[in-house]
Swiss-Prot record:
The keyword Lyase does not apply. This is Phenylalanine--tRNA ligase alpha subunit. Mg(2+) binds at E258. Binds 2 magnesium ions per tetramer. Its main location: cytoplasm.
Length: 333
């Protein structure tokens, strides 16, 4: 498109630019029109330069008309540009709109593992009776795991068949009872503590796993007898598993308690399942820890969390609790 200076028709120029702007369909076409008409080296820029060269002190009317035409075309250009942008935004919104009539996606909430549920409930129960929670290390030395608990050197639990040894003096703890010794060393009676955590024994079948969880309890005070042990643990079992369960309290043997007992609960198949051991803290242990055994006595118990989980969730085998099968675990939400 070319226009001679002497035949400059402002109305024709404006109309021509308006037609071109009106007919463009996208930003790319509009940008080409802008460059031609009002760009740095566009139509108006060239005409102004030519007028300044030929008539530097004259023809102010034509210069003014060109300036007004330039402003008008620029205004129309920006208006058209905004219109195209708005249209593109509407198209984009339409394409990306969400159909709110469609059902939303389910939110998959996590939940506590069955083992964690039993531990949390057990801790809550004993804390309501005034027990405090303490924690210990899973790697223990031979003194706290065996010697301090009155377990002699020739005891079967010290062999490799039952215990995972790290070296001659360290092992993976076989019970959480070692924590009781550390508490009795550092604090004076009366004491009421519980401790839960992983323990390790070299045993694996449908009711045993090499790693399992225990909740250990200790109470040191005046006049603690076996009847108190039995009463507290019966209340715990009834609270967790219901009043209709059948419980058996039978004598047993543990090196660190005297007398000792075990509690069994009957499962749905009519079989007795051992869930915990308990007893009165052996006087020798109190004496070794410089606790006056004529004034104080103590009760101790160790609960098998997996056994409780089997009874609570009606499981016949403990091993599925450790295979991380979501289809199995989701049913316990």
């Amino acid at each position: 498109m070319s226009y001679h200076l002497e035949k400059l028709n402002i109305k024709f120029i404006i109309n021509q630019a308006l037609i071109e702007i009106k007919n463009c369909k996208n930003i790319k076409e509009l940008e080409l029109i802008r460059i031609y008409w009002i760009g740095k080296n566009g139509f108006f820029s060239k005409k102004n330069k030519l007028l300044n060269i030929l008539f530097p002190y004259e023809d102010f009317i034509k210069k003014d008309m060109l300036k007004k035409a330039y402003k008008k075309i620029k205004y129309i250009y920006f208006k058209k540009k905004q219109k195209i942008k708005n249209k593109e935004i509407k198209i984009k919104i339409f394409k990306e709109k969400i159909d709110i009539s469609l059902p939303g996606r389910d939110v998959c909430n996590g939940s506590f593992h069955p083992i964690s549920n039993i531990i949390r409930y057990s801790e809550k129960f004993f804390c309501s009776l005034g027990f405090s929670i303490v924690h210990g290390h899973e790697v223990e030395n031979i003194y706290y795991n065996f010697d301090a608990l009155n377990i002699p050197e020739n005891h079967p639990s010290r062999t490799e068949h039952d215990t995972f040894w790290i070296n001659e003096n360290c092992l993976l703890r076989t019970q959480t009872s070692g924590i009781q010794i550390k508490v009795m060393e550092s604090k004076k009676p009366p004491l009421k503590i519980i401790s839960s955590g992983k323990v390790y024994r070299n045993d694996h079948d449908k009711t045993h796993t090499p790693m399992f969880h225990q909740l250990e309890g200790l109470m040191i005070d005046e006049c603690i007898g076996i009847s108190i042990v039995k009463s507290i643990l019966y209340d715990f079992c009834y609270s967790l598993l219901g009043k209709k369960i059948k419980i058996r309290f039978r004598p047993s043997y543990f090196p660190f308690t005297e007398p000792s007992a075990e509690i069994d609960i009957m499962n749905e198949d009519g079989k007795w399942i051992e869930i915990l051991g308990c007893g009165i803290v052996h006087p020798k242990i109190l004496h070794n820890l410089k606790i006056d055994r004529n004034k104080y006595s103590g009760m101790a118990f160790g609960i098998g969390i997996e056994r409780l989980a089997m009874l609570y969730y009606k499981l016949s085998d403990v091993r599925p609790l450790f295979i991380n099968n979501l289809r199995f675990l989701k049913q316990f939400k």
